[in-house]
Curated annotation (Swiss-Prot):
The gene is pyrK. Transmembrane segments: none annotated. It comes from the Bacteria. The keyword Iron applies. Pathway: Pyrimidine metabolism; UMP biosynthesis via de novo pathway; orotate from (S)-dihydroorotate (NAD(+) route): step 1/1. GO terms for molecular function: 2 iron, 2 sulfur cluster binding; electron transfer activity; flavin adenine dinucleotide binding; metal ion binding; oxidoreductase activity. Signal peptide: none annotated. HAMAP family: DHODB_Fe_S_bind. Binds 1 [2Fe-2S] cluster per subunit. GO terms for biological process: 'de novo' UMP biosynthetic process. This is Dihydroorotate dehydrogenase B (NAD(+)), electron transfer subunit. Residues 2-102 form the FAD-binding FR-type domain. Belongs to the PyrK family.
Amino acid sequence: MMQKQNMIVVNQTEIAKNIYELVLQGDLVQQMNEPGQFVHIKVAEGITPLLRRPISICNVDQEKNEFTMLYRAEGQGTKTLAKRKQGELVDVLGPLGHGFPVEEAEAGQTALLVGGGIGVPPLYELSQRLVAKGVRVIHILGFQTKDVVFYEEKFAELGDTYVATVDGTHGTKGFVTDVIDNYGIDFDILYSCGPLAMLRALEGRYKEKKAYISLEERMGCGIGACFACVCHLQEDPSGHSYKKVCSDGPVFPIGEVVL
């Protein structure tokens, strides 16, 4: 159930170049039961910046009433958020959207989790949920360069983990698909989040597989009212049928929406 709450900053750390790990505490955490959902953050007290920022949920600790999110500080809004200190309050709306269907993976199966850049964080909570139900997980994490690599060790604690960097400064040189080819990775179900180019490449390969992708889109309201994040459906070539990433997604079965 969606709620709005002023949550307390437990801590905030820069864990890679311009990548921040923010831990917040509040009762709203009890509503976070679906990996892949996101929250809408009001980054400043005034009206500038006006719009909330959508940030995915990376980790949930309901015993402590805490959740973790990772984000890249690159625009006015996220740079403002990066200045928040321990003990301060952050206005949070969430959890929002529909997340990854953990129930689609069965115990004993192998799930491949593929993340690109800031699309990596929501896969961490997903991986923990899958491991808890007896699913073997393989992670492929794609980044531009070694300076922005994060959470490699945390993912490795859960299952086999491979890293690809475009410039080859860490892990495999190239893209996530190069890792799949180089290591001959096989799997039963695919979950992925990242840039459109990466998702298109995966869709081209695995349209017949059981697979789910999470889209990264700019959003206005985050609750399905403003129509700023619509995407067209592949089954309707006229382009008149659509879904909203914020409320119908951000997770969709592969092949359902036009990338």
